Swiss-Prot record:
A lipid is attached at residue 23 (N-palmitoyl cysteine). Residues 1-22 form the signal peptide. It is a lipid-anchor. One of its GO terms (cellular component) is plasma membrane. A lipid is attached at residue 23 (S-diacylglycerol cysteine). This is Uncharacterized lipoprotein SAS0400. Keywords: Cell membrane, Lipoprotein, Membrane, Palmitate, Signal. Belongs to the staphylococcal tandem lipoprotein family. Its main location: membrane. It is found in: Cell membrane.
Length: 256
């Protein structure tokens, strides 16, 4: 009886060990850390920067999944906006979004001017249709304001001059994860000596010497997905004044 009892105890102990090991293993991050995985996911597009000639995207293929129909070459969407609080309770936002269809080798989109209000007032928004030919933005709508017209025609996306070849050198970021979406975020403190920061300061009116934060956000699978999206933000905000640049480059099906 004592022998059988010892065998039973050993079996019970073995079951407990297996249970603890299997449960504990599920909470461990195997391989790369989430911070490294987020950076590697972003690197798939950021390694393409700077894209000086956007028409080069017609010959580049992104991540494909089951959402793509047979024969669909896909569509690149590039976006940049600059948001700034010029008055308390208001946020002015300008930028451009351009869809580059690899099937038709055409690029169409719009330049937008938005104003948001904190109080009970709907935002103002105006879109101006544009297309791209020979790597130049062509305004299709009539614009009375000569300064606005010039900004539209001379507009450059962040991805056309940004350079993230040293992305792997960004370390010790503040990582947050929402497993329900899932979504992933990591933030890094940038230096004013960073070439990307210098580029933004030379192109936009940024009335602060504060070094910005680099914020990287992913919705969806870290390995890639045509359903989710990635957004990069360089945030110069201080106190009650919002100042930021948002950028993204995505690859999705062109045919619904």
């Amino acid at each position: 009886m004592g022998y059988l009892k010892r065998i039973g105890m050993c079996i019970s102990l073995l079951i407990v060990i297996i249970f603890v090991t299997s449960c504990g293993g599920g909470n461990k991050i195997t391989g790369d850390s989430k911070e490294t995985q987020i950076k590697k996911s972003f690197a798939k597009t950021l390694d393409m920067y700077p894209i000086k000639n956007l028409e080069d995207l017609y010959d580049k293929e992104g991540y494909r999944d089951g959402e793509f129909k047979k024969g669909d070459k896909g569509m690149w969407t590039i976006y940049t906006d600059f948001a700034k609080s010029n008055k308390p309770g208001e946020l002015d936002d300008e930028g451009m979004v351009l869809n580059l269809d690899r099937n038709t080798r055409t690029a169409k989109g719009y330049y937008f001017v938005k104003k948001f209000y904190e109080k009970d007032k709907l935002p103002d928004r105006k879109n101006y249709k544009v297309e791209m030919k020979n790597n130049k933005s062509i305004l299709l709508d009539k614009v009375e304001d000569p300064n606005l017209k010039k900004r539209i025609e001379n507009f450059k996306f962040f991805g056309q001059y940004a350079n993230f070849k040293d992305l792997e050198n960004y370390n010790n970021g503040d990582v947050s994860i929402n497993w329900n979406v899932p979504s992933y975020d990591v933030e890094y403190k940038m230096s004013n000596k960073d070439e990307n920061v210098k580029q933004l300061r030379s192109r936009y009116n940024i009335p602060t010497d504060k070094a910005p934060m680099l914020k990287m956000h992913i919705d969806g699978d870290l390995k890639g997905s045509s359903v989710g999206y990635k957004r990069l933000e360089i945030d110069f905000s201080k106190e009650d004044r919002d100042i930021s640049v948002i950028d993204y480059l995505s690859y999705k099906p062109a045919k619904k």
